[in-house]
Amino acid sequence: MRELPEFPWDVLLPYKKRAAAHPDGLVNLALGEPVDATPDVLRDALAAATDAPGYPPTEGTPALREAAAAWLRRRLGVTVDPSAVLPAVGTKELIAWLPAMLGTGPGDTVAFPRLAFPTFDVSARLAGARGRPVDSPLELGSEPVKVVWLNSPSNPEGRVLSVPELREIVAWARDRGAVLVNDECYIEYGWDRRPVSLLDSAVCGGSHDGLLAVHSLSKRSNLAGYRAGVCSGDPALIGRLLQVRKHAGHAVPAPVQAAMVAALEDDAHVERQRDRYAYRRRVLRTALEGAGFRVEHSEGGLFLWATRGEPCWPAVQKLADLGILVAPGAFYGEAGEQYVRIAFTATDERIAAAAARLT
């Protein structure tokens, strides 16, 4: 394992303290953490499954795998066999350990976007591999690479890759025998452009060989506190992950698996949450642009990627003086040093407070 970086949210604590001193209180737009209530149908399913004296199946209950496969088909137009679905104890742990679980190690390369969720870099470090930030995997050419991370819609900038872009990357990865993984945790939150799954037949030609897609229930279902996600795709890769996870004890608790079934079977709560986020996004974007920020990309996901042409840390401090906490773009790579990432996951009241302070 290579040395790990400092945990980014620890670095932000002094700015959080500064923002919290505002007379009207803190508006936390940094983390992107769900704040709306977990839907009753999910909580009821969890409560009904709390008599769980035995160990849960690492591969997931049949009901969970079938619900996930049905959700993929219904919402994303993707066909997978339920056996090619694997639950995760939240997708962050899966992302962090996936290269290592697939046998990646010293001398191997793990590629990820130049602007990226920090855990992609951590996944290379935990495997002892070399992390390679790229604007596009295609720039690697014939350079050997073991695992390639995509993130569409992306965090932090909210970019959505098109079908032709994804198709070209799939062909490139297959030519080199690289495992290609798309973190699709924001796929149900496309705004200006419709996100498409890596497993869509228009992208992969109907074959999932060498491909995996990772889906989080934290954002779509307000389940961050439950730690729940799924991975699907190439059955052989899913099988390899399952074997490691069985040995490591990476099983989702049985009550959480029951709640996941309820979440994946119900679309109504997702549409309600989309409406909430669409409203908050609109209010916040208008206020930011009125305050001189330029919002770039942000076509999908739960963040606005914004700049006023100044370094990110002074921008973070100025916003903290207004009682608004945001994430510095430098957390996501050198290419983000002129940007801040602003989440619209706070309550309507806190979003309104932020908008008022920006005007």
Swiss-Prot record:
<dbReference type="InterPro" id="IPR015424">
    <property type="entry name" value="PyrdxlP-dep_Trfase"/>
</dbReference>
<dbReference type="InterPro" id="IPR015421">
    <property type="entry name" value="PyrdxlP-dep_Trfase_major"/>
</dbReference>
<feature type="binding site">
    <location>
        <begin position="91"/>
        <end position="92"/>
    </location>
    <ligand>
        <name>pyridoxal 5'-phosphate</name>
    </ligand>
</feature>
<comment type="similarity">
    <text>Belongs to the class-I pyridoxal-phosphate-dependent aminotransferase family.</text>
</comment>
<feature type="binding site">
    <location>
        <position position="341"/>
    </location>
    <ligand>
        <name>substrate</name>
    </ligand>
</feature>
<comment type="function">
    <text>Involved in the biosynthesis of the tetracycline antibiotic, oxytetracycline. Catalyzes the conversion of 4-dedimethylamino-4-oxoanhydrotetracycline to yield 4-amino-4-de(dimethylamino)anhydrotetracycline (4-amino-ATC).</text>
</comment>
<protein>
    <recommendedName>
        <fullName>4-dedimethylamino-4-oxo-anhydrotetracycline transaminase OxyQ</fullName>
        <ecNumber>2.6.1.-</ecNumber>
    </recommendedName>
</protein>
<dbReference type="InterPro" id="IPR015422">
    <property type="entry name" value="PyrdxlP-dep_Trfase_small"/>
</dbReference>
<feature type="binding site">
    <location>
        <position position="155"/>
    </location>
    <ligand>
        <name>substrate</name>
    </ligand>
</feature>
<keyword id="KW-0808">Transferase</keyword>
<feature type="binding site">
    <location>
        <position position="32"/>
    </location>
    <ligand>
        <name>substrate</name>
    </ligand>
</feature>
<dbReference type="InterPro" id="IPR019880">
    <property type="entry name" value="OxyQ"/>
</dbReference>
<dbReference type="GO" id="GO:0030170">
    <property type="term" value="F:pyridoxal phosphate binding"/>
</dbReference>
<dbReference type="GO" id="GO:0008483">
    <property type="term" value="F:transaminase activity"/>
</dbReference>
<keyword id="KW-0045">Antibiotic biosynthesis</keyword>
<feature type="binding site">
    <location>
        <position position="186"/>
    </location>
    <ligand>
        <name>pyridoxal 5'-phosphate</name>
    </ligand>
</feature>
<feature type="binding site">
    <location>
        <position position="227"/>
    </location>
    <ligand>
        <name>pyridoxal 5'-phosphate</name>
    </ligand>
</feature>
<feature type="modified residue" description="N6-(pyridoxal phosphate)lysine">
    <location>
        <position position="219"/>
    </location>
</feature>
<dbReference type="GO" id="GO:0017000">
    <property type="term" value="P:antibiotic biosynthetic process"/>
</dbReference>
<comment type="pathway">
    <text>Antibiotic biosynthesis; oxytetracycline biosynthesis.</text>
</comment>
<feature type="binding site">
    <location>
        <position position="92"/>
    </location>
    <ligand>
        <name>substrate</name>
    </ligand>
</feature>
<feature type="binding site">
    <location>
        <position position="155"/>
    </location>
    <ligand>
        <name>pyridoxal 5'-phosphate</name>
    </ligand>
</feature>
<dbReference type="InterPro" id="IPR050881">
    <property type="entry name" value="LL-DAP_aminotransferase"/>
</dbReference>
<feature type="binding site">
    <location>
        <begin position="216"/>
        <end position="218"/>
    </location>
    <ligand>
        <name>pyridoxal 5'-phosphate</name>
    </ligand>
</feature>
<dbReference type="Pfam" id="PF00155">
    <property type="entry name" value="Aminotran_1_2"/>
</dbReference>
<keyword id="KW-0663">Pyridoxal phosphate</keyword>
<keyword id="KW-0032">Aminotransferase</keyword>
<dbReference type="InterPro" id="IPR004839">
    <property type="entry name" value="Aminotransferase_I/II_large"/>
</dbReference>
